[in-house]
UniProtKB/Swiss-Prot annotation:
Signal peptide: 1-18
Name under which the protein is recorded: Alpha-2-HS-glycoprotein
Source species of the chain: Mus musculus (Mouse)
Observed phenotype of the null mutant: (Microbial infection) Increased prepatent period of Plasmodium berghei infection. Fewer Plasmodium berghei exoerythrocytic forms.
Gene giving rise to this polypeptide: Ahsg
Classification of source organism: Eukaryota, Metazoa, Chordata, Craniata, Vertebrata
Record-annotated disulphide pairs: 32-336, 89-100, 114-132, 146-149, 208-219, 230-247
Length: 345
């Protein structure tokens, strides 16, 4: 009898520790494809994207689990597990998420797994807790789907570093205004055929002009950060190398006082020989935030900076999606996990 009492006590203690802080012990399970669950999940992903510091924006792929806890004295707390997928839009890109393409499996996709606790009280949502991590698709799965598709390559790979330096030098060469520095290597792949290296990276405007830079270390980033996102390809030909780079500037870049009156255009392309002119100074590749750059992707575990809370009026940040009503006949769908919106990794 004493053993049974002790067992019940331990069960109650475990339940108290598992429940989100401030809730009662009672909860209800909500179907993962319920419009209510989808609305809260979209809000959670929106919160995630608003606080990403590096890497790429995320899109909701699947809701794995939902519990709705009663909160004393008022409100409810949604405890959710969701899967996300990386998009092609960088975290700093102001492009609306709806206009961002999902990174496809053939591009070596990366999946995010997130746990959220979201309070709903008086029609207001507040994110109380967030914990995420990322996992790329396995090389084996990519090879099965597309044997010749390039895989993710470490940021500190020799070809990657060389391509980023060369591409940034090419961009600064054809730019008559602000000198840009590297902020982050976002993605890299070595392509076997034709032999080339693909890179995506973030740049930022400095207080120097591109034509007058002699020591990049003396160029400081502007107080109000002005970022751009670049994609580059370095072809390894028999007769040498050729780089092509295209950069999208997220805002109109202010020019230093002694700069040319004509500033850089929002999108710039360059196709130049790999070796920059002697007058062009290439700064070293930056290793951001002290993380080892044998990484091949930006893990949400490090890229996401959680904030204590973010309040959002229910209907201001997102709208409930149109969810089809179930037919009169047919098998009953399981409550969870929910539907896969794109593809499963």
């Amino acid at each position: 009898m004493k053993s049974l009492v002790l067992l019940l006590c331990f069960a109650q203690l475990w339940g108290c520790q598992s429940a989100p802080q401030g809730t009662g012990l009672g909860f209800r399970e909500l179907a993962c494809d319920d419009p209510e669950a989808e609305q809260v999940a979209l809000l959670a992903v929106d919160y995630l994207n608003n606080h990403l510091l590096q890497g790429f924006k995320q899109v909701l792929n699947q809701i794995d689990k939902v519990k709705v806890w009663s909160r004393r004295p008022f409100g409810v707390v949604y405890e959710m597990e969701v899967d996300t997928l990386e998009t092609t839009c960088h975290a700093l890109d102001p492009t609306p998420l709806a206009n961002c393409s999902v990174r496809q499996l053939t591009e070596h996709a990366v999946e995010g797994d997130c746990d959220f606790h979201i309070l709903k009280q008086d029609g207001q949502f507040r994110v109380m807790h967030t914990q995420c991590h990322s996992t790329p698709d396995s090389a084996e799965d990519v090879r099965k789907l597309c044997p010749r598709c390039p895989l993710l390559t470490p940021f500190n790979d020799t070809n990657v570093v060389h391509t980023v330096n060369t591409a940034l030098a090419a961009f600064n060469t054809q730019n008559n205004g602000t000198y840009f520095k590297l902020v982050e290597i976002s993605r890299a792949q070595n392509v076997p055929l034709p032999v080339s290296t693909l890179v995506e990276f973030v740049i930022a405007a400095t207080d120097c002009t591109a034509k007058e830079v002699t020591d990049p270390a003396k160029c400081n980033l502007l107080a109000e950060k002005q970022h751009g996102f670049c994609k580059a390809n370095l072809m390894h030909n028999l007769g040498g190398e050729e780089v092509s780079v295209a950069c999208k500037l997220f805002q109109t870049q202010p020019q230093p006082a002694n700069a040319n009156a004509v500033g850089p255009v929002p999108t710039a392309n360059a196709a130049l020989p790999a070796d920059p002119p002697a007058s062009v100074v290439v700064g070293p590749v930056v290793v951001p935030r002290g993380l080892s750059d044998h990484r091949t992707y930006h893990d949400l575990r490090h890229a996401f900076s959680p904030v204590a809370s973010v309040e959002s009026a229910s209907g201001e940040t997102l709208h409930s999606p149109k969810v089809g009503q179930p037919g009169a006949a047919g098998p009953v769908s399981p409550m969870c996990p929910g539907r896969i919106r794109h593809f499963k990794i």
